[in-house]
């Protein structure tokens, strides 16, 4: 999408085509096979990095493509549309890459960004805790000074892909020297650091990327593990959350496209009394409605990414939340309608749609719940009184 039209630039169209052509070599069957064997999608990730797709949004001087969140979300959408959506794309290049590129020191950028860009290094993100989900002000992971070092202690939960990561960006709290009050702070923690451990959470998701509980038991970090200023971490954190929502929306749009593609192919060829079942309005209309909803969500996702890339943080926050909400709802309905349209075949492994039901449902919960988005829109967009 350019500034003057809804037509993507030739460069973006070429990128979309290149990603779609490449990821078709993997597809949903590859993704499901890896998930069911409890294996990582290492080949897919490495090749995405080698081709420049993972780091397309990161600065060129650190090995990235020098583009923006629009381009990275485009990559995410096309991968999801092929049935190979990877949560770590939301985390490593989008959240962490963005925060480090914007607020990291030169040394931090040189150390972490090239690896994130080419896929040789994966960085997880740890914010959620057992008693702190959307209410992130309840985070209890703390960082205290010990000479020039930091000592980190706490627990995190529902952390994606920590077993694939070499480092994790941890959201904790540090003690303000003058007042003793705790304030947010961001730290890069190597996953092989003494005192750092994790255990898997058994989920009903069909995904090669697993979820984990993370334990930080007095993990000692050097002074330069802190990302950004101690007194501005909340701003740094939110700089990574708009990309998170944009990428979540792009993933959901792609999932919706995938499900509709499978369903449409099926109803075009499945015949009852010599007539394709797709000729009946009882099937055609719900699928058409889902297509409309997915396309509308895609437009809002593109708007959010465009606003973000133009530096309109407030406008991007509103649009990113709306995009995430719209895409999650549209994707969930599209997957459900695909299964319904295919009948019993929609629940078989052969057609590969049923496995997406929990993933589509997850999109309505994470990275921010639909209810919290509605709270945000009610308060910020409509100016209604705060409800919590």
Swiss-Prot record:
InterPro entries: Acyl-CoA_dehydrogenase, Acyl-CoA_Oxase/DH_mid-dom, Acyl-CoA_Oxase/DH_mid-dom_sf, AcylCo_DH-like_C, AcylCo_DH/oxidase_C, AcylCoA_DH/ox_N, AcylCoA_DH/ox_N_sf, AcylCoA_DH/oxidase_NM_dom_sf. Keywords: FAD, Flavoprotein, Oxidoreductase. It is an enzyme of class 1 (oxidoreductase). GO terms for cellular component: cytoplasm. Its EC number is 1.3.99.-. Its cofactor is FAD. GO terms for molecular function: acyl-CoA dehydrogenase activity; flavin adenine dinucleotide binding. It catalyses: a 2,3-saturated acyl-CoA + A = a 2,3-dehydroacyl-CoA + AH2. PANTHER family: DEHYDROGENASE, PUTATIVE (AFU_ORTHOLOGUE AFUA_7G06510)-RELATED, MEDIUM-CHAIN SPECIFIC ACYL-COA DEHYDROGENASE, MITOCHONDRIAL-RELATED. Belongs to the acyl-CoA dehydrogenase family. This is Acyl-CoA dehydrogenase fadE12.
């Amino acid at each position: 999408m350019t500034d003057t039209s809804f037509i993507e630039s030739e460069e973006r169209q070429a990128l979309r085509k290149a990603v779609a052509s490449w990821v078709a070599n993997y597809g949903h069957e590859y993704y499901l096979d890896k998930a069911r064997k409890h294996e990582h999608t290492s080949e897919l990730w490495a090749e995405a990095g080698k081709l420049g797709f993972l780091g397309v949004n990161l600065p060129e001087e650190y090995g990235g493509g020098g583009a923006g969140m629009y381009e990275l979300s485009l990559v995410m959408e096309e991968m999801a549309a092929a049935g190979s959506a990877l949560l770590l794309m939301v985390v490593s290049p989008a959240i962490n890459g963005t925060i480090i590129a914007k607020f990291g020191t030169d040394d931090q950028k040189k150390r972490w960004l090239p690896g994130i860009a080419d896929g040789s290094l994966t960085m997880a993100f740890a914010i959620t805790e057992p008693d702190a989900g959307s209410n992130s002000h309840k985070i209890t992971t703390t960082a205290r000074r010990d000479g020039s070092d930091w000592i980190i202690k706490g627990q995190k939960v529902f952390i994606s892909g920590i077993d694939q990561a070499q480092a994790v960006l941890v959201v904790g709290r540090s003690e303000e020297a003058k007042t003793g009050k705790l304030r947010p702070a961001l730290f890069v923690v190597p996953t092989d650091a003494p005192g750092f451990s994790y255990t898997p959470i058994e989920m009903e998701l069909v995904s090669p990327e697993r979820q984990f509980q993370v334990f930080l038991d007095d993990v000692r970090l050097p002074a330069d593990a802190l990302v950004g200023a101690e007194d501005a971490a909340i701003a740094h954190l939110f700089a990574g959350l708009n990309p998170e929502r944009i990428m979540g929306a792009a993933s959901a749009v792609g999932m919706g496209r995938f499900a509709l593609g499978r369903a449409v192919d099926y109803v075009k060829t499945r015949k009852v009394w010599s007539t394709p079942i797709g000729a009946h309005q009882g099937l055609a209309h719900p699928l058409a409605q889902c297509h409309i909803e997915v396309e509308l969500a895609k437009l809002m996702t593109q708007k959010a990414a465009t606003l973000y890339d133009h530096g309109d943080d407030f406008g991007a926050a509103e649009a990113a939340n709306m995009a995430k909400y719209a895409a999650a709802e549209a994707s969930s309905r599209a997957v459900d309608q695909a299964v319904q349209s295919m009948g019993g075949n929609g629940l078989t492994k052969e057609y590969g749609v049923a496995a997406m039901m929990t993933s589509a449902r997850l999109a309505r919960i994470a990275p921010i719940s639909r209810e919290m988005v509605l709270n945000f829109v009610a308060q910020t967009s409509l100016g209604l009184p705060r409800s919590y």
